[in-house]
């Protein structure tokens, strides 16, 4: 993902935390904030020390980034969202990570087909 697709600044993270609702499953928490004037989605990742050592945390972040890249055509565009990994996320394979993210994105209505069916 290019840098323009990332939420990096602490102030941006706080804005999303404060102004949005969270949705969670066993392994991930997602905060979503609609940004109508924005061209595309932006994502912020947070993987705390409870997930594991630095190698495990970086692996979880790589899996999340790869999953989001594969889901990019299906994601709603003018939105900022944060993905927070929970303790069990380091036990997941790449395929399991993607399935868990799809599940939590459906709950957060971040996927296009979910948003279309919710508006009908």
UniProtKB/Swiss-Prot annotation:
The keyword GTP-binding is annotated on this UniProt entry: no
Signal peptide positions (record): none
Top EC group: hydrolase
GO cellular component: ribonuclease P complex
Catalytic activities: Endonucleolytic cleavage of RNA, removing 5'-extranucleotides from tRNA precursor
Superkingdom assignment: Bacteria
Keywords on record: Endonuclease, Hydrolase, Nuclease, RNA-binding, tRNA processing
InterPro entries in the record: Ribosomal_Su5_D2-typ_SF, Ribsml_uS5_D2-typ_fold_subgr, RNase_P, RNase_P_CS
Hydrolase listed as a keyword: yes
Alphabetized Pfam families for the sequence: Ribonuclease_P
One biological process term in Gene Ontology: tRNA 5'-leader removal
EC identifiers of the protein: 3.1.26.5
GO terms, molecular function: 3'-tRNA processing endoribonuclease activity; ribonuclease P activity; tRNA binding
Gene3D superfamilies the UniProt entry points to: 3.30.230.10
NCBIfam families: rnpA (TIGR00188)
UniProt record similarity statement: Belongs to the RnpA family.
Summary of subunit composition and partner proteins: Consists of a catalytic RNA component (M1 or rnpB) and a protein subunit.
Protein purpose: RNaseP catalyzes the removal of the 5'-leader sequence from pre-tRNA to produce the mature 5'-terminus. It can also cleave other RNA substrates such as 4.5S RNA. The protein component plays an auxiliary but essential role in vivo by binding to the 5'-leader sequence and broadening the substrate specificity of the ribozyme.
Stated name of the protein: Ribonuclease P protein component
């Amino acid at each position: 993902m290019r840098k323009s697709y990332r939420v990096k600044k602490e102030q941006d993270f706080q804005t999303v935390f404060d102004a949005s609702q969270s949705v969670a499953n066993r392994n991930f928490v997602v905060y979503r904030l609609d940004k109508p004037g924005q061209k595309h989605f932006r994502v912020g990742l947070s993987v705390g020390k409870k997930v594991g050592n630095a190698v495990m945390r970086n692996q979880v972040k790589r899996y999340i980034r790869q999953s989001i890249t594969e889901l990019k055509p299906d994601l709603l565009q003018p939105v900022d969202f944060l993905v927070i990994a929970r303790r069990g996320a380091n036990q997941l394979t790449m395929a399991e990570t993607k399935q868990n993210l799809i599940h939590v994105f459906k709950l957060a209505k971040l996927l296009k087909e979910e948003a279309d069916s919710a508006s009908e």
